[in-house]
């Protein structure tokens, strides 16, 4: 009986020596990994230097080339706003007629444009170009904005109105076809369903 009784060491279960495999992979983030990662500091004596800082040779008498900087900056920015939007120094509210509006609504009516164009052999173009003579007038307006503003600013009769209700108002009864209505009384030729 004395041989079967073994003494249990209490430290045996608390030490991880008896574990054969780890429960999780080393890539799994466990516990307070964010805080632990913040505490980590690499043991180095000096601040790390980048390759540029290591290989940089200072030139004390060097002056920056502002001309090449200006050229590269203007090349990256492209054409300025005034060259893209303004046309012959006209104010912007006078040439709002688009090419689509000119072609379909005004039917290419432009009194300033000559009737016939001539071929310019030096520039290899038909001159004058239509874009050189823009239509100077306010844009074509069919009253859509005013109609929508009148609808938007109208007094609200009820507070709970959806977009569907405001966009599609209810039609009057006279607008509906009478043939689509259900017959209120059964036809005399129809026999009632017998009930047993």
Swiss-Prot record:
Entry's Gene Ontology cellular component terms: axonemal A tubule inner sheath; axonemal microtubule; sperm flagellum
Stretches for region Mn 2: 97-109
Subcellular location: Cytoplasm, Cytoskeleton, Cilium axoneme; Cytoplasm, Cytoskeleton, Flagellum axoneme
Subunit structure: Microtubule inner protein component of sperm flagellar doublet microtubules.
UniProt superkingdom: Eukaryota
Keyword Cytoplasm on entry: yes
Record keywords, A-Z: Cell projection, Cilium, Cytoplasm, Cytoskeleton, Flagellum
GO biological process, one term: flagellated sperm motility
Region span, Mn 1: 47-62
Name of protein: Cilia- and flagella-associated protein 107
Major location category of this protein: cytoplasm
Function: Microtubule inner protein (MIP) part of the dynein-decorated doublet microtubules (DMTs) in cilia axoneme, which is required for motile cilia beating.
InterPro entries from the UniProt entry: CFAP107, CFAP68/107
């Amino acid at each position: 009986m004395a041989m079967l009784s073994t003494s249990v060491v209490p430290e045996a279960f608390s030490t991880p020596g008896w574990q054969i495999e780890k429960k999780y992979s080393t890539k799994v983030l466990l516990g307070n990994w964010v805080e632990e990662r913040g505490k980590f500091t690499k043991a180095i004596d000096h601040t790390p230097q980048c390759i540029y800082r290591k290989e940089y040779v200072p030139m004390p008498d060097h002056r920056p080339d502002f001309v090449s900087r200006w050229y590269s900056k203007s090349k990256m920015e492209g054409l300025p706003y005034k060259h893209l939007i303004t046309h012959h120094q006209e104010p912007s509210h006078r040439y709002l007629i688009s090419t689509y509006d000119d072609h379909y609504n005004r039917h290419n009516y432009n009194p300033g444009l000559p009737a016939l164009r001539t071929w310019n052999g030096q520039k290899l173009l038909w001159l004058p170009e239509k874009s050189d003579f823009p239509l100077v007038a306010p844009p074509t307006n069919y009253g859509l904005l005013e109609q929508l503003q009148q609808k938007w600013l109208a007094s609200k009769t009820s507070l709970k109105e959806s977009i569907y209700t405001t966009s599609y108002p209810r039609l009057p009864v006279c607008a509906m076809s009478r043939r689509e209505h259900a017959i209120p009384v059964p036809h005399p030729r129809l026999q009632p369903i017998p009930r047993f």
